[in-house]
């Protein structure tokens, strides 16, 4: 099995106590985009308790693995994925496209609880939790 790139939704689900449906693989990675989304969640928390929960999630993610960066390979993968979605007459979801592009460029599967990644299934293996 290839490495699993965990989408932001996996960490939000764990934070909220939602089941993932299966155990996570031993080899996991995260995108720097997921780190940014989780940091935004901390900054936008409506109250101190929510902020504390979100900060704990962010710290857990940072301890899990170094975030995969957005580099030239990821940029090329992003352009390919976004052009495919646009050619089909749909508007790509920017953050999800970056996460899928990170997976594509790094030979990883996207593990997610979101249905938003179906646009990329022809190019990137998607594991829906």
What are these regions (language model features)?
Residues 17-18, 41-45, 81, 88, ...:
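Residue-level signal for well-ordered alpha-helical positions
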């Amino acid at each position: 099995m290839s490495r699993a790139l965990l989408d932001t939704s996996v960490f939000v689900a764990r934070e909220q106590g939602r089941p993932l449906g299966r155990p996570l693989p031993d080899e996991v990675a995260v995108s720097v985009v997921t780190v940014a989304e989780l940091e935004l969640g901390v900054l936008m928390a409506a109250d101190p308790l929510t902020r504390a929960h979100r900060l704990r999630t962010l710290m857990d993610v940072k301890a899990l693995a170094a975030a995969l960066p957005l580099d030239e390979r990821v940029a090329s993968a992003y352009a390919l994925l976004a052009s495919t979605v646009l050619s089909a007459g749909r508007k790509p979801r920017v953050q999800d496209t970056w996460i899928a592009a990170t997976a594509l460029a790094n030979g990883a599967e996207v593990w997610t609880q979101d249905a938003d990644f179906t646009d990329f299934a022809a190019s990137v293996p998607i594991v829906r939790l």
